A protein has these predicted regions:
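Short, surface-exposed acidic-centric catalytic microdomains
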Residues: 25-86
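Short, hydrophobic/glycine-enriched beta-strand segments
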Residues: 14-20
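Short, well-ordered beta-to-alpha junction loops that form the rim of enzyme active sites
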Residues: 20, 109-113
Length: 157
């Protein structure tokens, strides 16, 4: 069974971005979006107006400084490889419990599997975003960034 990471969260977060489940590369590195081909970190650095860094503590610190939390919809599952289509035996994370007493106003779902697993259980706006995964190669970076920027800007600034 694959176990998700602990959330990156504090009570000042206004946006919670939910993925599905860590990839093989992410699990090996012990980091969210650890596959260098995944565009999540490039999107977030640009969206938040910060200079890109490969340092994971810089990445997570940037999110929290800007009121962005990060977690997965799936708490544990079985999966061969990294593709979301191979996920089975899902136990969802309790998103409502995480943000019950915080200031999250928007839950953003990164990709189709996150959307499929998530159950509207929170008092917040919910937005569906195209996946930053390399499996979503049909969407170029500029288009992907534009969609994310349009959806999240009202909650970040």
């Amino acid at each position: 069974m694959i176990e998700s990471f602990a959330p990156i969260y504090d009570k000042n977060c206004r946006v919670l971005i939910l993925g599905s489940c860590p990839s093989v590369q992410s699990l090996a590195k012990g980091e969210y979006y650890g596959n260098r081909q995944n565009r999540f970190w490039r999107v977030m650095f640009r969206l938040l107006g910060e200079e890109y860094s490969d340092d994971y503590s810089v990445k997570t610190g940037m999110l929290l400084r800007h009121g962005v939390a990060l977690w997965d919809t799936i708490g544990s599952c079985a999966r061969q490889g990294s593709l979301d289509s191979a996920i089975k035996d899902v136990r969802p994370n309790d998103v409502a419990a995480l943000i019950r007493d915080g200031g999250v106003r928007c839950v953003a779902l990164n990709g189709g599997k996150a959307k499929a697993v998530f159950r509207q259980q929170v008092d917040a706006d919910v937005v569906f975003l195209p996946s930053t995964s390399p499996a979503n190669a049909r969407m170029d970076f500029e288009t992907l960034f534009s969609v994310w920027q349009k959806a999240l800007s009202p909650y970040l600034y």
